[in-house]
Structures are given as C-alpha cells and as structure tokens.
C-alpha cells in the first residue's frame, strides 16, 4: 500500500480541519417523519400510502424507492415457508447529478401520496399460500423548491400478509416476459456494439477488474477504510468485503464471465436518468446512453463514472455475490449511513469503497490548487 510521504504529512496537518461528521446510522435516524402503509388492493396488487408526518414540506426523489415508476424492487416478499420470492425486475443505477424539478414529488405536511403496484409483475409467486410483504428504505430529499439532495428520510412499513393463488399470479403479465422468453443466444445478436462502444466497454471492464482487485487486497488490511464504508472492523467483515470485491473483479470481463455484459438496451428500459441496469434473475447488465457519456474515471469526489458503474452493477448479480446486492442507498452520505449488515448488501458501498483510492485527491483539492497533478493514492 503506497502513500506519498509529502501527502501524508499534509494530510496529517489538515486532518483536524477536514474532520467530517460521522454519518448517522439509519436506526438512529428513524424519526417517523415519513410513514409508509401497505394495504391490499386485490390479489397481487398493493397500495402504498406515503404520509409526511412532519411540520415541513418534503421534496422527495423517487429513484429506487417505494415511489419508483420503473419495474424495480419496492417491497421484500417472503412466502410462509421462509423463502424469498425471486425478483424478476430490474436494478437500475440512476444519474444523480443535475437533477430536475420533474423528478421530485412534493409532499406537504400531513399530506399523503399513494402508489399502486402489482408484485406479480416483478416477483415469481410460484407457491400458493401466505406471503408477507414489507418495505424499508430511505428517500432522498431536496430543499423545498430545489433539486440538490440535502438529506434522506427513512421509512419502514407495516408487514402486509396476502393470500396468493400461484396459478392466478402466473396469469399477470410480467414486466420482462417478452424479453426473457428469448434465449440468451437469440438476445445476443440484437446487441449491437460499434467499435467505439466495444472499446469503451472493454476499457471500463478492465479498469473495474483492476480497481476491484486492488480494493479486495486493501479490505484485508485497512480496518478504518472498511469501517468508513461498511461500519464494522472485525476480520469477518473485512474478509467478506474482500471476497465480494474479488468476485466482482473476476466477473469484469466480456470473455468467460458469469455475467453477460451487453452493449445496448435490448429490453428498452433506459430512462433519461438511467446509467445502466441489471437483471439479477439473468445475470445480465445493460448500459444506457448515459453510460457512454460518462468519463472512464471521474476525478471528482464520489462521482459516478463507467468504472464505478461496472463495479456497482457487478455486485447486483447473484453469480458474483450471493445474496446479490440491492440498492439500499445511493451516494457516499447515504451508503455510509447504512448499518453494517445493510452496507454489505448495498451495491454502491462496494463501488464507493473501490473508487475511494482517489480520496486523498478529493480532500486536498479543496485547499490546494493542483491543476497539473492527478493523484491516485492507494489505501
């Protein structure tokens, strides 16, 4: 592990000034500002009633939350046997920069908004009997009338029990039935990859392979860095994080990977803010137009780029990480505020941890102008 002596000295001098508040854990942040109530709405239909219990308006961003309009995971679904229903939807990574007003929902104090969805469209309800549903997460919040994320409000719903007839549930059209009905061999010819995209994708995979490999080694030794991103210092956590990053590194290749890395949006699910998305049920990753517009590596602190996106999406695949990682929190502040168990299940924690070798540069550029130096500091 390398450090530049001069940088270490400067870092020591600046440490008191740069001390950042430790993000509050999500348990400590539950203040009932936002409540979510799940109610049955007909066989496999669910109505989520989201209420602002606070005294101020909430400006809520819906990405990867109970309010998301995409066929994403909104609730956890468990059969009475204890088995979790397989998720058949998409896990998208959204662009969180330059957000616009239309992406937010304004919720005045004591007001509610309802969101209706059918769990059968994205879950395999193959068993008859009782299913238990619950939603838990955090919704990014901007200032009222603004679009800059300043905080998150946490929610934890009631548990909803539903009696489901598997035969009837199977009659509900699933979100990606048309696409999944084709074999992988038939889907691949539709994946048009021009020379530039082929080059950029391979470069992103190779970059992610190297970065994840280095991060896996760092996780075994850098206790404080592991604590920063995964909220635990014990050897078991360091080993688990290291193993997951090693698996992501091995999967980051177009040749012989357990993940199919596509060049195009075959299913047609790229929205204007979607960078890429994964089908965990198929171990497939699809990039969106935004992916190609991003830098290979972003030289700004904790910002999104192609290499980090490959690591993030790699963590979503069950052939790489078991159980696969979900989207429980986006961005540095939210990801580092998760509990240890949830941080280890969150894709962004692995991407942020792996890309954090740029952290020294991120801190120093606040105080020192270094226009001609691009610093990469290993953990």
Curated annotation (Swiss-Prot):
<dbReference type="InterPro" id="IPR050414">
    <property type="entry name" value="Fungal_M35_metalloproteases"/>
</dbReference>
<keyword id="KW-0732">Signal</keyword>
<feature type="active site">
    <location>
        <position position="313"/>
    </location>
</feature>
<dbReference type="InterPro" id="IPR001384">
    <property type="entry name" value="Peptidase_M35"/>
</dbReference>
<comment type="function">
    <text>Secreted metalloproteinase that allows assimilation of proteinaceous substrates. Shows high activities on basic nuclear substrates such as histone and protamine. May be involved in virulence.</text>
</comment>
<keyword id="KW-0165">Cleavage on pair of basic residues</keyword>
<keyword id="KW-0862">Zinc</keyword>
<dbReference type="InterPro" id="IPR024079">
    <property type="entry name" value="MetalloPept_cat_dom_sf"/>
</dbReference>
<keyword id="KW-0325">Glycoprotein</keyword>
<feature type="glycosylation site" description="N-linked (GlcNAc...) asparagine">
    <location>
        <position position="221"/>
    </location>
</feature>
<feature type="binding site">
    <location>
        <position position="327"/>
    </location>
    <ligand>
        <name>Zn(2+)</name>
    </ligand>
</feature>
<keyword id="KW-0964">Secreted</keyword>
<keyword id="KW-0479">Metal-binding</keyword>
<feature type="signal peptide">
    <location>
        <begin position="1"/>
        <end position="19"/>
    </location>
</feature>
<keyword id="KW-0865">Zymogen</keyword>
<dbReference type="GO" id="GO:0005576">
    <property type="term" value="C:extracellular region"/>
</dbReference>
<feature type="disulfide bond">
    <location>
        <begin position="270"/>
        <end position="288"/>
    </location>
</feature>
<dbReference type="Pfam" id="PF02102">
    <property type="entry name" value="Peptidase_M35"/>
</dbReference>
<feature type="binding site">
    <location>
        <position position="316"/>
    </location>
    <ligand>
        <name>Zn(2+)</name>
    </ligand>
</feature>
<feature type="binding site">
    <location>
        <position position="312"/>
    </location>
    <ligand>
        <name>Zn(2+)</name>
    </ligand>
</feature>
<protein>
    <recommendedName>
        <fullName>Neutral protease 2 homolog TRV_03208</fullName>
        <ecNumber>3.4.24.39</ecNumber>
    </recommendedName>
</protein>
<keyword id="KW-0843">Virulence</keyword>
<feature type="disulfide bond">
    <location>
        <begin position="193"/>
        <end position="263"/>
    </location>
</feature>
<feature type="propeptide">
    <location>
        <begin position="20"/>
        <end position="187"/>
    </location>
</feature>
<dbReference type="GO" id="GO:0004222">
    <property type="term" value="F:metalloendopeptidase activity"/>
</dbReference>
<keyword id="KW-1015">Disulfide bond</keyword>
<comment type="similarity">
    <text>Belongs to the peptidase M35 family.</text>
</comment>
<keyword id="KW-0482">Metalloprotease</keyword>
<keyword id="KW-0645">Protease</keyword>
<keyword id="KW-0378">Hydrolase</keyword>
<dbReference type="GO" id="GO:0006508">
    <property type="term" value="P:proteolysis"/>
</dbReference>
<dbReference type="GO" id="GO:0046872">
    <property type="term" value="F:metal ion binding"/>
</dbReference>
């Amino acid at each position: 592990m390398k450090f530049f002596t001069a940088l270490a000295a400067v870092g020591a001098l600046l440490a008191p000034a740069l001390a950042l508040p430790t993000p509050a854990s999500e348990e400590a942040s539950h203040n009932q500002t936002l409540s979510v109530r799940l109610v049955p709405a007909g066989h496999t239909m669910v109505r989520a009633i989201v209420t602002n219990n606070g005294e101020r308006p909430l400006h809520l961003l819906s990405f990867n939350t109970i309010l998301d309009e995409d066929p994403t995971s909104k609730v956890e679904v468990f059969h009475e046997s204890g088995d979790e229903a397989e998720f058949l939807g998409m896990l998208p990574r959204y662009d969180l920069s330059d957000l616009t007003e239309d992406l937010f929902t304004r919720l005045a104090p004591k007001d509610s908004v309802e969101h209706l969805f059918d769990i059968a469209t994205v879950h395999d309800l193959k068993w008859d009997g009782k299913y238990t549903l619950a939603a838990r997460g955090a919704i990014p919040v901007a200032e009222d009338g603004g679009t800059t994320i300043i905080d998150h409000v946490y929610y934890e719903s009631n548990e909803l029990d539903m009696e489901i007839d598997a035969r009837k549930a199977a009659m509900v059209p699933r979100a990606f039935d048309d696409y999944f009905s084709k074999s992988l061999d038939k889907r691949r010819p539709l994946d048009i990859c021009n020379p530039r995209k082929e080059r950029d994708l391979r470069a992103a995979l190779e970059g992610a392979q190297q970065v994840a490999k280095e991060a896996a080694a760092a996780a075994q030794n850098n206790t404080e860095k592991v604590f920063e991103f995964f909220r635990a210092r014990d050897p078991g956590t360091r080993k688990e994080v290291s193993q997951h990053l090693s698996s992501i590194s091995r999967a980051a290749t177009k040749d012989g990977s357990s993940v199919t890395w596509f060049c195009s949006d075959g299913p047609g699910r790229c929205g204007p803010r979607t960078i890429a998305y994964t089908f965990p049920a198929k171990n497939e990753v699809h990039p969106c137009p935004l992916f190609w517009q991003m830098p290979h590596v972003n030289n700004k602190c904790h910002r999104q780029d192609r290499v980090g996106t490959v690591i993030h999406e790699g963590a979503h695949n069950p052939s790489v990480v078991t159980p696969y990682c979900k989207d429980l929190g986006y961005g540095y502040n939210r990801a580092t505020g998760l509990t240890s168990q949830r941080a280890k299940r969150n894709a962004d924690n692995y991407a942020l941890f792996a890309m954090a070798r740029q952290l020294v540069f991120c801190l120093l550029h606040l105080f020192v102008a270094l226009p001609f130096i691009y610093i990469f500091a290993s953990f």
